[in-house]
A protein has these predicted regions:
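N-terminal beta-alpha lobe that positions the nucleotide/phosphoryl donor
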Residues: 1-278, 282-300
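Structured core elements
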Residues: 10-11, 54, 83, 160, ...
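A generic structural motif
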Residues: 207, 294-297, 347, 525, ...
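Catalytic cores of soluble metabolic enzymes centered on carboxylation/carboxyl-transfer
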Residues: 263, 302-522, 602-605, 639-645
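Conserved nucleotide-binding/hydrolysis modules and their immediate coupling elements
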Residues: 519-542, 548-549
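C-terminal amphipathic alpha-helical interaction region
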Residues: 534-540, 554-555, 596, 604
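Catalytic P-loop NTP-binding/switch module of NTPases
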Residues: 539, 545, 549-583
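Structured functional modules or segments
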Residues: 571-649
């Protein structure tokens, strides 16, 4: 049988993974095909492809999850193969079968392997038969509340509800006691149905202080299977990974081999082909428990690439062509250490609520040895509420863990992003934290150090306001004469004939405001985007980026946005929202749980909003009566839109 021919590759995904797959495909000489929703028509992955096909729709369910549309796009574009990326349909056996039935090549495992491992319940049953240790739980077919209540009582609280058909934190809820179970189960089932088209759940004992260690496996069509070392993904928020590194700190060669060989046996038992990841929970005693197998390329694959020097997407393409793996287990490299952080559009101070809006400022850290940025956005892009809020990933490699950590801190300092809330400062605090530097890792890291990682906003100092005001004034666009620095018209800093140069500014930053009058002679000068500040004989250079009406100033490790403040407009805006509950982000209304005239207790669910494939409950801040409803199920709402008016009683 002749080897399959792949000259044109369609990527059935979006964002950074679509861009990353296309980069390797182009390097191998392939023609790349992007698919996009109506919302993503001008998204970066669409712009970078050789060919792009419009799927229509906005929500994933109307575009990226439409198997028939994806198959039609492949045929229309002349693609012989489809790469699923991660998320969406990447672990959908029906998609793999449809691709095969259409005479196309799926860059993933056989549908039978996805069936075996794609369902967490089936995978755990399979591993149980194979003698792999499992966390106590319920993985059965019955999905009613009574069954889950009985299972939770048998397992013992706290428990973790998980969607059987997916990952990424979607459809996952921690339940502390039986009073939370009904609401948590219903919400998790809706999230799972929305994200994966499958509402089935399983429940497990929620282990305390485990590490999340996963093994990268790779298999070809000739029966060969390797493990490409491991990754530690313990630092998570909302059960979704935020920081990943390879190799796992403190793992002995013996434990690495034991976990790697167990992962290979798991893959071979189901006839696996391609890239996959076997995830384990590792306790402090060195015992590991099978958690799940992801039958796809992982978000965090770049750290494995960094320590092995391999291109896993290139391996996927070559394996799909029928080539054998190019090395033996003994030849798999392990060089140095790599750490990755995920950059999200979200508000860490507000329970990591996804953020939407325009990327007014977006500048990536400089490329160089040991530095890598995988992203799917550019300055000026709109971040919509329809998809996962990840913008990209920063990856640093070093000869040892500390070199990688310091290099990553430098990359985070160089990164400039503005226009919407992101987790970049939160990431920097994690990487700079003494416990992270000491590799004291487990899945409770973020909750344990929450006060340091998410500090309450402090009062901005006088030094900050002076520097901000000088940078704001000196960057005003009124500088008319650039050809003659000595001309009085070359400066818009408030110069008035016969009087001292003076300018008064009313500025705001992060909810704080200050009025400042600047006189000539301050020891602050702005040259390009470098602000030189002198204080008590010490001269520092800060980054100051003017972007439209905003100034972004790097201060004490964080990029802060400064704007001109209008006190009258601010007062009017605050009065307009009194008594009203507004949408915290763009999204769609999936449930309205109250009626006009209904009395509600403090904390009661009023409305459920879906954005970025996650549900967010709008709750009553105090007891009251519903005076008005401004939304109904199915409505699309914008951030700040009034949803419910509550009258306090």
């Amino acid at each position: 049988m002749s080897a399959p021919v792949i000259t044109t590759l369609l990527v059935a995904n979006r964002g950074e993974i679509a861009c990353r797959v296309m980069r390797t495909a182009k390097a191998l000489g392939l023609t790349t095909v992007a698919v996009h929703s109506a919302t993503d028509r001008d998204a970066r992955h669409s712009r970078e492809a050789d060919i792009r096909v419009d799927l229509g729709g906005s929500k994933a369910a109307d575009s990226y999850l439409q198997i028939d549309k994806l198959i039609a796009a492949a045929k229309a574009s002349g693609a012989e193969a489809i790469h699923p990326g991660y998320g969406f349909l990447s672990e959908n056996a029906g998609f793999a079968r449809a691709i095969e039935a259409a005479g196309l090549i799926f860059l993933g495992p056989p549908a039978s392997a996805i069936d075996a491992m794609g369902s967490k319940s089936a995978a755990k049953a399979l591993m149980e038969k194979a003698g792999v240790p499992l966390v106590p739980g319920y993985h059965g077919e019955a999905q009613d509340l009574d069954t889950f209540r009985e299972a939770c009582e048998r397992i013992g609280y706290p428990v973790l509800l998980k969607a059987t058909a997916g990952g990424g934190g979607k459809g996952m809820k921690v339940v502390e006691d039986v009073s939370q179970l009904a609401e948590a189960l219903a919400s998790a089932q809706r999230e799972a149905q929305s994200s994966f088209g499958d509402s089935r759940m399983l429940v497990e004992k929620y282990l305390l202080k485990p590490r999340h260690v996963e093994i990268q496996v790779f298999a070809d069509q000739h029966g060969n299977c390797l493990y490409l070392n491991e990754r530690d993904c313990s630092i998570q928020r909302r059960h979704q990974k935020v920081v990943e590194e390879a190799p796992a700190p403190g793992l002995t060669p013996e434990l690495r081999r034991a976990m790697g060989e167990a992962a290979v046996r798991s893959a071979q038992a189901i006839g696996y082909v391609g890239a996959g990841t076997v995830e384990f929970l590792l306790d402090a005693r060195g015992e590991f428990f099978f958690m799940e197998m992801n039958t796809r390329l992982q978000v965090e694959h770049p750290v494995t690439e960094a320590i092995t020097g391999l291109d896993l997407v290139a391996w996927q393409i070559r394996v799909a062509r029928g080539e054998a793996l190019p090395m033996t287990q003994a030849q798999v490299p392990l060089n140095g250490h790599a750490i990755e952080v995920r950059l999200y559009a979200e508000d860490p101070a507000n329970d990591f609520l996804p953020a939407t809006g325009r990327l007014d400022l977006y500048r990536e850290s400089a490329q160089g040895p040991g530095r890598r940025v995988d992203s799917g956005v550019e300055e000026g892009d709109e971040i919509s509420p329809f998809y996962d809020p990840m913008l990209g990933k920063l990856v640093a490699w070093g000869e040892d863990r500390e070199q990688a950590r310091l290099r990553l801190l430098s990359m985070l300092d160089e990164f400039a992003i503005g226009g919407l809330k992101t987790n970049i400062n939160f990431l920097r605090r994690i990487i700079a934290h003494p416990a992270f530097a000491a590799a004291e890792l487990d899945t409770g890291f973020i909750p344990r150090y929450q006060e340091q990682l998410l500090p309450a906003p402090g009062t901005l100092s006088d030094e900050f306001w002076q520097a901000a005001a000088q940078a704001f004034a000196q960057s005003l666009p009124a500088r008319k004469r650039t050809d003659d620095p000595a001309s009085p018209w070359s400066c818009g800093s408030g110069l008035r004939a016969g009087l001292p140069a003076e300018i008064t500014l009313h500025l705001s930053c992060e909810g704080q405001e200050r009025a400042l009058t600047l006189a000539a002679g301050a020891h602050v000068s702005l040259l390009g985007e470098a602000l030189a500040v002198e204080h008590d004989g010490v001269r520092r250079t800060l980054r100051a980026i003017r972007q439209g009406d905003s100034l972004y100033l790097q201060w004490e490790g964080e990029l802060r946005r400064i704007e001109a403040h209008d006190p009258i407009s601010a007062v009017e805006a605050s009065h307009s929202h009194q008594g009203g509950l507004t949408a915290p982000m763009n999204g769609s209304i999936v449930r309205v749980l109250v009626e006009v005239g209904q009395a509600v207790e403090a904390g009661a669910q009023l409305v459920v909003l879906e954005a970025m494939k996650m549900e967010h409950s709008i709750r009553a801040p105090q007891a009251g009566v519903v005076k008005a409803l401004y939304c109904q199920e199915g409505d699309m709402v914008s951030e700040g839109s009034a949803l419910v008016e509550l009258e306090q009683v």
